Design a protein with these regions (language model features):
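Recognition helix of helix-turn-helix/homeodomain-like DNA-binding domains
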Residues: 25-39
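A short, Lys/Arg-rich alpha-helix, primarily the initiator
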Residues: 1-17
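Conserved hydrophobic/aromatic packing and binding residues within compact polymer-binding modules
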Residues: 5, 19-20, 30-33, 59
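The alpha-helix within a helix-turn-helix
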Residues: 9, 20, 49
């Protein structure tokens, strides 16, 4: 999932800090996803999907 997120973030040339500020998802949470400490909850995926204007299923597709 993080790889998909990172692709969207990088494509838009924004930082994790900007995503965190805009969505309310903390940079610590984003870091935990990156490091594989835990998977995102569905409500956070919905927030990211809306933020990046993609269907939530985008994050579930094979990487």
């Amino acid at each position: 999932m993080y790889k998909k997120y990172a692709e969207l973030r990088d494509k838009r040339n924004i930082t994790d800090y900007r995503v965190a500020a805009d969505t309310g998802i903390s940079t610590a949470t984003l870091s935990n996803w990156k490091n594989g400490n835990y998977a995102p909850k569905f409500d956070k995926l919905l927030i990211l999907a809306k933020y990046f204007d993609v269907p939530v299923e985008y994050f579930a597709e094979a990487e």
